[in-house]
Amino acid sequence: MPSMSGITRRRLLASLPAVALARRALGAGSPEGLRHEFIQAGASGPPIRVRTISHFGLAVPDPKRSVDFYQGLFGMPVQARVDTTTILRVGAGPQFISIGPAAANAAPSINHYCLGIENFAVDRVLAALAAHGVTKGDTAGPMKVAVTMRDGTPDLLFGDPDGIVCQLQDVSYCGGSGPLGNVCRTVEPSPKKGLLALRDLSHLTIFSSDAERSNTFYQDLFGLSIRSYQGPTAPTLAIGPTVAFLMFAGGAPARGGATARPASINHACMSLDGFNPEQVLKTLETHGVTPRGDSAGPAGPMKSYVTMRMENRGGAPGGTPELYFTDPDGLLMQLQDSSYCGGSGFLGNVCK
């Protein structure tokens, strides 16, 4: 979710008892017109049945530094290697984070994400994408799809209306070999135990040039239902039977002649069991990720902060704490409880 103003540790500690209090379901105050529009989009059944968030990819100038950082923090084993890309397992897998080199002179980025679908078959997926205006191209540009063969493994990537790259693979995909990319026989243990144990991938928040258009596009293509609302016109789109979701934000015109914010994957969220924001902040600090403090503007690399999502954005009465940190390249990550669904309650786990 888009970040808000930070809070101090003292305020965070004062809010911790709210974990047993905030149990309010979302949706009663949501605009019925918006709700109807989104439900109708998937009423005839999804042409492509999405079940999981499979992975997201980091493109960075120093992949080894990033691999060392994430293994040191989370103890992630190497699930597979593809050329110069290292695939780090999340939890029990097959979900993962891929870390590879950025193009020359390119800024570090979360350069794509992948959704796991049932009964993956390239021809069927291409036909479904074509029916929604996504046509074949040499690369995954806006409304274009490209399939590359990797030693017999098809990797299918397409660009949405903003050119955000989404990959579609089988739910069993591990970044490995075989027709479904689900053969990862040689798993390399992490050289470091890790300080926090990841459970799963929670969500991605994507800055779009037109959030309403993005929501409609993904609803029509995947038949995604509404998981929660983080504001009257800010739905989260449910991914399969899990608590995972996608969220699209943005689309407001730039103010005062400023340049509009380019579309991008703003941040990725990972989940862990027994989420305690104060303890997580302390653990991050032992790994060199220090509190951001009250400084204005974007957080630099290796910083952490907590924001409180209040009732007007679907949070708990006292606020739902949401914890962010930046990695060595300044890429923004979020950590939440494994039950987090983007809803209300102290843990953000109360959804409709």
Named regions from a protein language model:
Residues 52, 84, 93, 109-111, ...:
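Residues that flank catalytic or metal-binding motifs in active/ligand-binding sites
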Residues 29-64, 111-113, 169-215, 243, ...:
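N-terminal beta-strand motif that seeds the catalytic metal site of vicinal oxygen chelate
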Residues 2-20:
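N-terminal secretory signal peptides and thylakoid transit peptides that target proteins
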Residues 5, 20, 48, 57-97, ...:
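Core segments of cupin and vicinal oxygen chelate
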Residues 61-64, 113-162, 208-213, 263-332, ...:
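Vicinal oxygen chelate
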Residues 22-24:
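C-terminal segment of classical bacterial N-terminal signal peptides
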Residues 94-98, 107, 163-166, 175, ...:
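Short, charged/polar, Gly/Pro-enriched secondary-structure boundary elements
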Residues 84-120, 126-127, 252-253, 262-265:
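Mid-chain, structured segments of secreted extracytoplasmic proteins
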